[in-house]
Swiss-Prot record:
It comes from the Eukaryota. GO terms for biological process: exocytosis; protein transport. The lineage of its organism: Eukaryota, Metazoa, Chordata, Craniata, Vertebrata. Interacts with STX1A, STX2 and STX3. Interacts with STX11. Keywords: Exocytosis, Protein transport, Transport. The keyword Methyltransferase does not apply. The keyword Chaperone does not apply. Belongs to the STXBP/unc-18/SEC1 family. Signal peptide: none annotated. The gene is STXBP2. InterPro entries: Sec-1-like_dom1, Sec1-like, Sec1-like_sf. Involved in intracellular vesicle trafficking and vesicle fusion with membranes. Contributes to the granule exocytosis machinery through interaction with soluble N-ethylmaleimide-sensitive factor attachment protein receptor (SNARE) proteins that regulate membrane fusion. Regulates cytotoxic granule exocytosis in natural killer (NK) cells. This is Syntaxin-binding protein 2.
Amino acid sequence: MAPSGLKAVVGEKILSGVIRSVKKDGEWKVLIMDHPSMRILSSCCKMSDILAEGITIVEDINKRREPIPSLEAIYLLSPTEKSVQALIXDFRGXPTXTYKAAHVFFTXTCPXPLFSEL
C-alpha cells in the first residue's frame, strides 16, 4: 500500500530517493544532516527505519565529528553556504578525508554559484 499523508510521502521519498538510492548490500553508511534537514527527517521517519536501511550513525554536520574514513557518507543538506562549506571541510582533511566517499542530496534546488563551490 502506498504511503498516505504528507509526512508519510516525504518519509518514503527520503528512504527511497536518498538512502536506498546509494545502498549496497552489507555496506553501512553514515547519514550527515544540517538542522533543517534533521527536522524534516525526524518529523517523518523513525530512527529504526533509517537504521534498517544500513545507516550506522546519524550526525549533525555543524558539530564536531570523529572521522570514519572506512565508511561512505550520505549528506542530506539544505542548500546554504554554511552547510556547503561544512561539507567541503570534511574532505579537506589531511592525511585522510573524514569519510570514504560522499553522496550529496539537497532538500531544495541548490543555487548554481553554491553548487559550483563543490
